UniProtKB/Swiss-Prot annotation:
Protein name: Uncharacterized protein YozT
Protein backbone atom coordinates (compact mmCIF):
# COMPACT_ATOMS: atom_id res chain seq x y z
CA UNK A 1 0.00 0.00 0.00
CA UNK A 2 1.37 3.39 -1.00
CA UNK A 3 0.31 6.46 0.98
CA UNK A 4 1.06 9.96 -0.26
CA UNK A 5 0.26 12.98 1.91
CA UNK A 6 -1.73 15.55 -0.04
CA UNK A 7 -2.63 18.53 2.13
CA UNK A 8 -5.43 20.47 0.43
CA UNK A 9 -7.27 22.54 3.00
CA UNK A 10 -6.68 22.96 6.70
CA UNK A 11 -7.66 21.34 8.95
CA UNK A 12 -8.44 18.43 6.62
CA UNK A 13 -5.76 15.94 5.71
CA UNK A 14 -6.00 14.07 2.42
CA UNK A 15 -4.27 10.78 1.77
CA UNK A 16 -4.06 9.30 -1.70
CA UNK A 17 -3.84 5.57 -1.10
CA UNK A 18 -2.92 3.20 -3.90
CA UNK A 19 -4.83 0.07 -2.96
CA UNK A 20 -5.73 -2.67 -5.46
CA UNK A 21 -8.86 -3.89 -3.66
CA UNK A 22 -10.56 -0.50 -3.78
CA UNK A 23 -13.63 -0.06 -1.62
CA UNK A 24 -13.65 -3.67 -0.45
CA UNK A 25 -10.70 -2.78 1.78
CA UNK A 26 -12.23 0.51 2.94
CA UNK A 27 -13.32 -0.90 6.29
CA UNK A 28 -9.85 -2.27 6.98
CA UNK A 29 -8.20 0.99 5.92
CA UNK A 30 -10.60 2.98 8.11
CA UNK A 31 -9.79 0.82 11.13
CA UNK A 32 -6.10 1.20 10.38
CA UNK A 33 -6.41 4.99 10.26
CA UNK A 34 -8.37 4.99 13.51
CA UNK A 35 -5.42 3.30 15.19
CA UNK A 36 -3.19 6.24 14.28
CA UNK A 37 -3.31 9.84 15.51
CA UNK A 38 -5.99 10.69 12.95
CA UNK A 39 -9.26 10.90 14.77
CA UNK A 40 -12.03 11.00 12.18
CA UNK A 41 -12.30 9.65 8.66
CA UNK A 42 -14.83 11.93 6.99
CA UNK A 43 -14.81 11.24 3.27
CA UNK A 44 -13.19 9.01 0.73
CA UNK A 45 -13.16 8.75 -3.02
CA UNK A 46 -11.92 6.06 -5.34
CA UNK A 47 -11.36 5.32 -8.98
CA UNK A 48 -9.89 1.99 -10.07
CA UNK A 49 -7.14 1.33 -7.53
CA UNK A 50 -6.82 4.86 -6.16
CA UNK A 51 -8.51 5.67 -2.86
CA UNK A 52 -8.67 9.13 -1.30
CA UNK A 53 -9.17 9.29 2.47
CA UNK A 54 -10.07 12.56 4.16
CA UNK A 55 -9.44 12.95 7.89
CA UNK A 56 -9.93 15.79 10.35
CA UNK A 57 -8.83 16.62 13.88
CA UNK A 58 -11.41 16.15 16.68
CA UNK A 59 -11.89 19.84 17.47
CA UNK A 60 -12.39 20.69 13.81
CA UNK A 61 -14.95 18.09 12.82
CA UNK A 62 -16.97 19.21 9.83
CA UNK A 63 -18.29 17.76 6.58
CA UNK A 64 -15.68 17.81 3.85
CA UNK A 65 -18.19 18.98 1.26
CA UNK A 66 -15.52 21.05 -0.47
CA UNK A 67 -13.88 17.88 -1.80
CA UNK A 68 -14.26 18.20 -5.56
CA UNK A 69 -12.14 15.59 -7.27
CA UNK A 70 -12.87 15.15 -10.97
CA UNK A 71 -13.77 11.63 -12.07
CA UNK A 72 -14.06 10.40 -8.49
CA UNK A 73 -17.13 9.11 -6.70
CA UNK A 74 -17.57 10.46 -3.18
CA UNK A 75 -18.46 8.11 -0.32
CA UNK A 76 -19.25 9.01 3.27
CA UNK A 77 -17.39 6.84 5.74
CA UNK A 78 -19.41 5.95 8.84
CA UNK A 79 -17.27 5.21 11.88
Amino acid sequence: MTVINDYREEPEEAFWILYPMGVKCLSMITKSLLNTNRDFVTDCAFQLNILLIMTVKPKQVQPVSSLKTANFKIFYVKI
